[in-house]
């Protein structure tokens, strides 16, 4: 698993995985490379991309472009999550919960990279089932998309934020 971090303007880019894959044809095998990347602004915007090409740099470039085009907004609460969230994709399941200041990002592998570029600073996270990086990233993004701020919930229900929080 390789990690490369670059600053493109204000976006943080992380390379999560590069994999060699092959296509078997009559004359033998044709090798190509896949790359999984995440891109974020460190302030609640994050996206991931998966690129494939005959050469590693081209695969990484394609993945970065796809990640930039597929960014989502995440409602963060002062560097942590709004509430505990679960996400799943195929055989991967993830659970993330907010943590107090100073905890750091307690998460493994692909999930850590997504949370870092999204701007989450304190979180407790666990991946269950398959730990395939692509599926873990998709499950993490799905969980972050499902997270709603109290303001969003209040607006949907037509109530005040105080009523939602029970204050």
Curated annotation (Swiss-Prot):
Specify one Pfam family.
Ribosomal_S5
Checking InterPro entries in the record gives: Ribosomal_Su5_D2-typ_SF (IPR020568), Ribosomal_uS5 (IPR000851), Ribosomal_uS5_bac-type (IPR005712), Ribosomal_uS5_C (IPR005324), Ribosomal_uS5_N (IPR013810), Ribosomal_uS5_N_CS (IPR018192), Ribsml_uS5_D2-typ_fold_subgr (IPR014721)
Tagged with keyword Ribonucleoprotein: yes
Q: S5 DRBM domain spans which residues?
A: 11-74
Q: Which UniProt keywords apply?
A: Ribonucleoprotein, Ribosomal protein, RNA-binding, rRNA-binding
Query: Is Ribosomal protein found in the keyword set?
Result: yes
Q: Can you list the GO cellular component terms from the UniProt entry? A: small ribosomal subunit
Extract the GO molecular function terms from the UniProt entry: rRNA binding; structural constituent of ribosome
A single GO BP annotation from the record?
translation
Q: What's noted about domains in the record?
A: The N-terminal domain interacts with the head of the 30S subunit; the C-terminal domain interacts with the body and contacts protein S4. The interaction surface between S4 and S5 is involved in control of translational fidelity.
Function noted in UniProt: With S4 and S12 plays an important role in translational accuracy.
Q: Which family is this protein grouped under? A: Belongs to the universal ribosomal protein uS5 family.
Quaternary state and interactors? Part of the 30S ribosomal subunit. Contacts proteins S4 and S8.
* UniProt-listed PANTHER family: MITOCHONDRIAL RIBOSOMAL PROTEIN S5 (PTHR48277:SF1)
Q: Which HAMAP family match?
A: Ribosomal_uS5_B (MF_01307_B)
Designated name of the protein: Small ribosomal subunit protein uS5
Originating organism: Serratia proteamaculans (strain 568)
Gene encoding this chain? rpsE
């Amino acid at each position: 698993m390789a990690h490369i971090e670059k600053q493109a303007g204000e976006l943080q880019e992380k390379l999560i995985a590069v994999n060699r894959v092959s296509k078997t044809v009559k004359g033998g095998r044709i090798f190509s490379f896949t790359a999984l990347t995440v891109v974020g602004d460190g302030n609640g915007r994050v996206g991931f991309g998966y690129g494939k090409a005959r050469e590693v740099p081209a695969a990484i470039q394609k993945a970065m472009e796809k990640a930039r085009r597929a960014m989502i907004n995440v409602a963060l609460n002062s560097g942590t999550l709004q509430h505990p969230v679960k996400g799943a994709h195929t055989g991967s399941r993830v659970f993330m919960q907010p943590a107090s200041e100073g905890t750091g990002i307690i998460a493994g592998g692909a999930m850590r990279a997504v949370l870092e570029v999204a701007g989450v600073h304190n979180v407790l996270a666990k991946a269950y089932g398959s730990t395939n990086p692509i599926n873990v990233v998709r499950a993490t993004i799905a969980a972050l998309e499902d997270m709603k701020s109290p303001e969003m919930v209040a607006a949907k229900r037509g109530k005040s934020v105080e009523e939602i929080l029970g204050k």
